[in-house]
């Protein structure tokens, strides 16, 4: 039972992290399919655990999974929870969904579904009182979102005042903010010309735009909105149909996309799915599937919800389209914690209007599993219509010119001997701050929110300080002066003084933040908290050993090995000792 519990904890942390990356930072690092696999695995493990162990359901870990809001925006509490949809990727899973619905409502002869496109944008909740837009917010964790009203007011397709008669006293309108492909292309061309970072896809561009602090930027980005549902519906006329409610919402001036379908049977739903899949490449906006809902509001309420999903609705996703290309280079990148990540470079292909020329292979095991070789022909797809991924190698096209990939044993940046994990799945460089590739990223991480949080000193400024020779190790942050900042950034006295004061203020830091700021392989915020709770002092952590680490929950061999290797490194020890003298570290 302990093994199952530990697996649940591990999956919970993974899903929380991916929720944060997707919903809060708008920067997903795994595909929707892989996310769904993790979530479904968590569901299965919880069922098994709580079946065998009689515990209060309130402590179920899955209920804690959600995306926290950024602290840039204020909180908004949804009147009715803004739930996510469970995703499926094949028609046989829809058959199962349909079967369960019909079994539950045996007394009803015809079950009617409402189907529409699953827009790939940012879900928003619009709250109107007496016909006036009072607030707009993101989904957040389903109960609490970010108040983005000022930015939403800049989107012309969102009514600021409800038109028509019989306007409800209170209503929550739910829909998707998106960017058209044509506008996305123009935006990226503009970013390219001005030397700014390009957006990876229209969804990230839309979500990133809505979270801008300057509403004028939102206005320039030409964002659009389609309504797909509602939360609170305080209306004097009783309307039991989801479809009829949407038609009423359309009469009030909200944009409802023309392609939807009221389906009387399973066959009509599947026909609509194939139709949507066929035309999606012709649309000027991204869709990644269709949404299937029970049309009757009464039946929806009877079914209710499970965990964070409604039982009466489901998202049927499209299969990703593959394209063939040829690999011409494999490089090994050094990450912040020293992790070595193989990246495949191939001749550019175009998938849904996006040019793709490389894909991460994630780890060494992927190379072995796929048997990827240099000059191989491969099929590439966008996982979840977002992340480029190699599906398979076209072995029949392999010729005598292909070359086996040689896995490095020494760091490509600093030539330090690499350390391999037990399962040989991953390897990392233990040189830490002595490795240039790591050092730049480590210094950025040290100053970030997960570290000491030096406000006002961003990534670009840190890179400049490194290039000018002012930053080599974390200690150098504390020897920065107003004069140095003014020389490099041409800042005024006030801003320079503010940054120096912020750095001085950050000298008082909790032990878990300090441990996390070091950027040890495998030690993120949650593990850092466990270590801080166990050791209670920086000196005890600094002098730890394998035996002590093995007693701490969730600290396995690989993490223990990484911690010991990091703390044994002479350069690291010197840096940590100096930091201990400079900082005021508390529990």
Curated annotation (Swiss-Prot):
KW Zinc (keyword) present: yes
Taxon lineage: Bacteria, Pseudomonadati, Pseudomonadota, Gammaproteobacteria, Enterobacterales
Pfam families assigned to the protein according to its UniProt record, in alphabetical order: DNA_ligase_aden, DNA_ligase_OB, HHH_2, Nlig-Ia
Binding, Zn(2+): 411, 414, 429, 435
SUPFAM superfamilies linked to this entry: DNA ligase/mRNA capping enzyme, catalytic domain, Nucleic acid-binding proteins, RuvA domain 2-like
Species per Swiss-Prot/TrEMBL record: Buchnera aphidicola subsp. Cinara cedri (strain Cc)
Gene: ligA
UniProt catalytic activity: NAD(+) + (deoxyribonucleotide)n-3'-hydroxyl + 5'-phospho-(deoxyribonucleotide)m = (deoxyribonucleotide)n+m + AMP + beta-nicotinamide D-nucleotide
Name this protein carries in UniProt: DNA ligase
Family classification: Belongs to the NAD-dependent DNA ligase family. LigA subfamily.
CC cofactor: Mg(2+); Mn(2+)
GO MF assignments: DNA ligase (NAD+) activity; metal ion binding
Keyword DNA repair included in the entry's annotation: yes
Family annotation (Gene3D superfamilies): 5' to 3' exonuclease, C-terminal subdomain, DNA ligase/mRNA capping enzyme, Helix hairpin bin, Nucleic acid-binding proteins
Binding sites annotated in the UniProt record for NAD(+): 32-36, 84-85, 116, 139, 176, 293, 317
Keyword list, A-Z: DNA damage, DNA repair, DNA replication, Ligase, Magnesium, Manganese, Metal-binding, NAD, Zinc
